[in-house]
C-alpha cells in the first residue's frame, strides 16, 4: 500500500471515534466493514456515549438486536439512561421486540419510565399493538392506568388504533375503561373516531364490542346530538344512537363495578377464585 493511500485510510479512520463507530456498527451503517461491537468495546468505545440523539443501547433496541442489548448491558450500559428525546431504551424495545424488552427488564429497566411527553413504554407497546410486550411489561409492574400529558392511558392509545389484542390484555389487567382525558375523550370515543373515518375492519368492530361490554354504558352525544363526524355516517350514527340511548342495565353496570372492585391485578386469576357459577365468571371476564 502506498504511503498516500495509507494516509487517506488513517484520516478516514480517525474521523470517527470508537464510540461513533460503535453506534454505526449497531445500526449496520458499515463505514468500517470489519468493525464489530465486541471488538469496539474492547478497544475502548464508550457504551454510554451519546452521539446526536442516539445511545448504543437505544440503537440496539431500535434494530431489535437482543444479543447486542445484552452485550451492551454486560459491558456497563446504563439501562435507564435517557437519549436525546428523553426516552429510555425500553421505550424503543416496547414498540418492536419482546426479546429486547425481557433482557432490559432482567437488567432492571424501569417499566414506568416517562419520556418527554410522559409516555411510558406500555403506552408505546399498546399503540403499536405489540401484545407480547404489553403482557411482559404488565407482568413486570407497569402501571396499566399510567397517564400521559393528555391524561390518556395505554388503553386509550390501543383503542385509538383499534388494537384488539392489546385492548384485551389491558382489560385483563384491570385497565380503567371510563377514564376521560383532558379533551373529554374516553377509550371508546377514541375508537369511534377511527370507525367514523370509514376505516373500520372486523377486528376493530370486535374491539368496539369488547370495550362496550367492559364499560357497560357510554355517551357520545352533547346536548342530545351526536358529533358531526359521527352524524355523517348514517348507519354508524344510528347504531351508536341506540347504544347511547339505552340505559345501562343492572347486569352490565354490576359487571363494571365488580371488575373495578377487584383492583389492579390479573382479573382472570382473580375471577377464577370467586364463588360464582362458571357462566357468571365468563360474564365478568367479558366472554360472550
UniProtKB/Swiss-Prot annotation:
UniProt modified residues of type Phosphoserine: 17
Keywords carried by this UniProt record: ANK repeat, Cytoplasm, Phosphoprotein, Repeat, Ubl conjugation pathway
SUPFAM superfamilies reported for this sequence: Ankyrin repeat, SOCS box-like
The record's account of how the chain is modified after translation: Phosphorylated by TBK1.
Coiled coil: none
ANK repeat coordinates: 52-81, 85-113, 117-146, 150-179
GO cellular component terms attached to this protein's record: cytoplasm
Domain SOCS box stretches: 235-288
Pathway(s) served: Protein modification; protein ubiquitination
InterPro entries attached to this UniProt entry: Ankyrin_rpt, Ankyrin_rpt-contain_sf, ASB8_SOCS, SOCS_box, SOCS_box-like_dom_sf
Predominant cellular place of this UniProt entry's protein: cytoplasm
Location within or outside the cell: Cytoplasm
GO biological process: intracellular signal transduction; protein ubiquitination
Subunit: Interacts with TBK1; this interaction promotes TBK1 proteasomal degradation.
Function of the molecule: May be a substrate-recognition component of a SCF-like ECS (Elongin-Cullin-SOCS-box protein) E3 ubiquitin-protein ligase complex which mediates the ubiquitination and subsequent proteasomal degradation of target proteins. Inhibits IFN-beta production through the IRF3 signaling pathway by targeting TBK1 via 'Lys-48'-linked ubiquitination, leading to its proteasomal degradation.
Domain remarks: The SOCS box domain mediates the interaction with the Elongin BC complex, an adapter module in different E3 ubiquitin-protein ligase complexes.
UniProt similarity note: Belongs to the ankyrin SOCS box (ASB) family.
Name listed for the protein in its UniProt record: Ankyrin repeat and SOCS box protein 8
High-level lineage: Eukaryota, Metazoa, Chordata, Craniata, Vertebrata
